[in-house]
Amino acid sequence: MPLLFILAELAMLFARLDSEGICLHITVPQKIEPRKGGDAEGKVTYVITIDGKPYSLHLRNHSFLSQNFLVYTYNETGSLYSDSSHFLAHCHYRGYVDEVPNSIVTLSICSGLRGFLQLENVSYGIEPLESSARFEHIVYQVKSDSSMLAGNDSHVWQIDQLDKGHFNEQDKNHSQLLPQSLKLHIIVGKFLFDYMGSDIMAITQKIFQIIGLVNAMLTQLKLSVVLASLELWSDKNHISTDGNATDILQRLLDWKRDYLTLQSNEITHLLIYRRRPKYIGAASPGEICSKSYVAGVGMYPEDIGLEGFSVVITQLIGLHIGLTYDDNIRNCSCPSAPCIMQQGALSSSGKKTFSNCSLHDYMHYVSNFDTQCLGDLSNVHVLQPNQAVCGNGIMEAGEECDCGNETECQFKECCDHETCRLKGSAQCGSGACCMPTCELSASGTPCRKAVDPECDFTEYCDGSSSHCVPDTFALNGHLCRLGSAYCYNGRCQALNDQCVSLFGKGSQGASYACFEKVNSPRENLANCDSKDSYSVPCGQQDVLCGKLACFRPPKNYKSPSQSVVYSYVHDSVCLSILPGLSMRSDGRDSAYVADGTVCGPQMYCINGTCKEVNFTGNDCNATKKCKGNGICNNFGNCQCFPDYRPPDCNLQIGSPGGSIDDGNTLRTESAFATKRLSKNEDSWVILGFFIFLPFIVTFLVGIMKRNERKIVPQGEHKI
C-alpha cells in the first residue's frame, strides 16, 4: 500500500515553537441578547476587550458531534467502557470578529468561553478565570515563529500516486462543490493522554477544540468533520508506538481490522505524543473510501499548541482527500501565507486557507475518484440537546428498543439496532427484563442485584416493561458499617474500602496529617471542588475531601503498575495516585475521596467539600413512616425488613420486605391474599390431622388388644 508522509522535519522547531500565554489580558465577556424574531435561533454575540479595544464576536451554533457520539476509556482492569452523559452538543459555536475582516472564531460557550480567535495574522486563546467570582476570562496571544521551518523543504510526496491532471484556470472555480462530511474516530495514545494531563474530561474538551479548528479550515472545501467517537487509551498503548510513522500506521491498520467495528465511512486517526519526531504523521493518500486502508497517525511534538496540532489533523485529512503538499513548481498561493498544505502552517498564527493548488487537487479528486463515503451534509445527523440517540443502549423517548450498536446488541432477532424499532411480533428488544425469546420476563424476576449489602437494594421486573425499574438505594446519609460510615448513592463510602480497592488487602485510610500533606492548601495543590473538570486548592476544612491518602499495606499492592505518589509524614509513608489513571465502577476518578465519605462529626464529602449531612427536601422519617421496621430509600419511601410489607412496613409473616419502588408486584394485596388463602388451606389440613390423630391412635390400639385376646395357646398332642 503506498503511503504518503507528512514530513515537517523539525530540526529547528523545538527551540521556540508555539509558546502560548506570554501576553495575558483579563476581560469580562458581555453577552448581547439577540433581537426577537428573525433568524436568531442558534446565534449569540459576545463583546470582549483586548488591550482596551472592544471586539464583537458573532457566533452561530455548530455541532460536530455525531448523534451516536461516545467517549471510550479503559478502567484499571483494562475493560473498555463508554460514556456520553457529560458532553453537551449545543456548546460549540463558530463565527467571526466583527471588527476584523476574514477572521474566524471557534468557541465552546458552556461554563464560560473556551477556544480561539484567529485574526488575519495573529491568534488569541480565551478561557475562564476559574478563581474569579466574576465572569472574568483570560485572553492570551498564541505566539509562533514561522521562521522555524524556513528553509526546511525536505518533505516527500509521490505525485505519481494520483493522476492530478493539468492545472488550468477553469479548475479554480470551486463554487460547484457540494457540502459534504466525513466521520472521524479519534484515538488518543497513552503518552499523549498523560502529556495532556491524564484527565478524561479535560482531554475531551481539548479534542473538541482541535476539531472545531479543523472544521474552520475545511469550510473552504465545503467539507465538515463529524466526530463519531473518541477513544482514550488511558491504561496503556494497545499497539506499539515505537518506530517511525509508517510502521505505526501499519500496526494501526492491522489493529483496526482486528478490533475496531466502525461504520464504513469512518476514518481512524491515532494521535500520539513524540517529543521530537522526524515526521509529524503518516496517512494513506486518496483512500478516503477504502475501509481497509483509510487511517492516519498524527504526532504531537513537545510544546506545540492546539492550534498548531489542528493543522496536523487537517493535513492528514487533506492527504485522504487527494491533496498534496504545496510547492513552487505549480505556483501555489493563498491570500494569507503560509497556506494550509505548506509546512510553515504548523507554526503560523491567524486564519489559515487552502492554496489554489489544494482547491484544484480536491476538485480533481471528487470528480474522478470514489467519494460516495463522503456524506451529504444535509443528511448528517449530529447530536442535538435532549435528543434520543439510537444505538447508545439507553431507551429514550421515541424509541421502541435500544440494544446498543451492531456489536453490542444481544437482541438482533428482536430489535433493529439502526432504527431502534421492534421486529415482527417481538414484545421487547432490549433491557434487563427482556428474554432472548423477545418476551417480557415474569413479574418478580430480579433484574438488578444489590451491589452493596447495606446501602443498595435488589430491583425486580414488573412484568409490563422490558427495562428494570430505576435504581433504589438507601437515603444518602444513612449510617453503615456499624455507624462508622455513610451510605451515598448506593454505596457504603468507608474510607478503608476505598484504599483496599486501590492498594489491596491491608490498606487503610491515612491520618489527617497525611491528607493535609497530600492536599496542602499552602502548596496550592488543586485537588478539591472538582467541577466541570476544573479544581481548586483545598481549604483547611476540606483536606479530607481532596485526593485519597492511604497507609502502605504490609504486602504488595493490588496494582503494582499503578502510578503511586509517596509522601512522608512523621515517619509514615502516605500513598496516593495520579488523577485520571483509575476509574471506579461509577466512572469517578479513584484518585479522589468518594462523595459521602466521612470528614467530620455529622459531615461528609460532596464534590471535594466537607458538608453537613442533612435530609432537607426528604420528609421520610424511618422511625415514624416505617414504624422502625425499615429504612428510607432514595425515593423517600420505606425499604421494609423481611416479614414486613411495604409501603408502611406492617407486620406480614413471610413477606420478603422491600419497597413499592423496587418493581416486585408480588407484594400486592391480592398476591398476599392468595398466599394467605393457600396458607389457610394448608393450616386447616394440618389442624384437622392433629384433631383426629388421638382417635386414630386409640382405634389402632383397640384393634391390637382384641387380636391379642383371640390368640389361644395350643398344647402338645401325644400318640
UniProtKB/Swiss-Prot annotation:
Propeptide: 20-179
Disulfide topology: C289-C373, C332-C357, C334-C339, C447-C468, C620-C632, C626-C638, C640-C649
SUPFAM superfamilies linked: Blood coagulation inhibitor (disintegrin) (SSF57552), Metalloproteases ('zincins'), catalytic domain (SSF55486)
Molecular functions per Gene Ontology: integrin binding; metalloendopeptidase activity
Entry keywords, A to Z: Developmental protein, Differentiation, Disulfide bond, EGF-like domain, Glycoprotein, Membrane, Signal, Spermatogenesis, Transmembrane, Transmembrane helix
Biological process per Gene Ontology, one example term: proteolysis
Tissue expr: Expressed specifically in testis.
Residues in Disintegrin domain copies: 387-476
PANTHER family cross-referenced by the UniProt entry: ADAM A DISINTEGRIN AND METALLOPROTEASE DOMAIN, DISINTEGRIN AND METALLOPROTEINASE DOMAIN-CONTAINING PROTEIN 18
UniProt name for this protein: Disintegrin and metalloproteinase domain-containing protein 18
Organism: Mus musculus
Taxonomic lineage of the native organism: Eukaryota, Metazoa, Chordata, Craniata, Vertebrata
